[in-house]
Amino acid sequence: MMQFDRSGLDGSPVDYETALQLQRRLHGEVATGTTAETMLLLEHAPVYTAGKRTTDDERPTDGTPVVDVDRGGKITWHGPGQLVGYPILRLREPVDVVGYVRRLESALIRVLGELGIAGERIEGRSGVWLPGDGTAPDRKLAAIGIRVAEGVTMHGFALNCSNSLEAYDRIVACGIRDAGVSTITEALGRTVTPQDAAPMVVAALQAEFGREAAPRAAQTETAA
């Protein structure tokens, strides 16, 4: 049974380093079988994080601090209004990392469809996108960057719900120069918050990964 933890959506954004330490602890416990698979859903305090393939020219030019992390992908931003999900799951053998990413994308495409948005994959690019229409370029709605060790996943996805896009102007988001970013709110013309999207995300991940979900015990919830 997969546990889910939405305590990071209580209105107090979670510091990135705090969440990272929790992920690492849970990863170790899931890997050894001492904790059930867990999905963390939260909002972060504003932060830039850089995956292993980030180059210097993609970072902020004004010296804004960036947290370097051990996930795939490049630089991105997290902050209030964005729903971040960290599934800590044991992948079935044989481990298929690309297949896992595609399943995360499928779950998020399902959520967007429920909201009335036709999110898509774009060949050669991870994440979920609004395709360009001749008046605007392809725009990313959800970024994905993961790590798998000992057959157990870490890191995850970031779904732009109602966040400002201003912070993206200071970086080359995900290392992609010929595309943009958007939010669910911008696409629909009405406000959709992380708290609004969270139940749909939980249901979509349950359906995609075939896990029954249960709330985490209070004593092990995320510390903000």
UniProtKB/Swiss-Prot annotation:
Transmembrane segments: none annotated. It holds the Pfam family LplA-B_cat. Pathway: Protein modification; protein lipoylation via endogenous pathway; protein N(6)-(lipoyl)lysine from octanoyl-[acyl-carrier-protein]: step 1/2. The active site is at residue 174. Substrate binds at residues 71-78, 143-145, 156-158. The record marks 140 as: Lowers pKa of active site Cys. Residues 51-71 are annotated as: Disordered. Its EC number is 2.3.1.181. Its main location: cytoplasm. It catalyses: octanoyl-[ACP] + L-lysyl-[protein] = N(6)-octanoyl-L-lysyl-[protein] + holo-[ACP] + H(+). Residues 33-213 form the BPL/LPL catalytic domain. Keywords: Acyltransferase, Cytoplasm, Transferase. It comes from the Bacteria. GO terms for cellular component: cytoplasm. The keyword Thylakoid does not apply. Catalyzes the transfer of endogenously produced octanoic acid from octanoyl-acyl-carrier-protein onto the lipoyl domains of lipoate-dependent enzymes. Lipoyl-ACP can also act as a substrate although octanoyl-ACP is likely to be the physiological substrate. NCBIfam families: lipB, PRK14345.1. Belongs to the LipB family. In the reaction, the free carboxyl group of octanoic acid is attached via an amide linkage to the epsilon-amino group of a specific lysine residue of lipoyl domains of lipoate-dependent enzymes. This is Octanoyltransferase. It comes from Leifsonia xyli subsp. xyli (strain CTCB07). The lineage of its organism: Bacteria, Bacillati, Actinomycetota, Actinomycetes, Micrococcales.
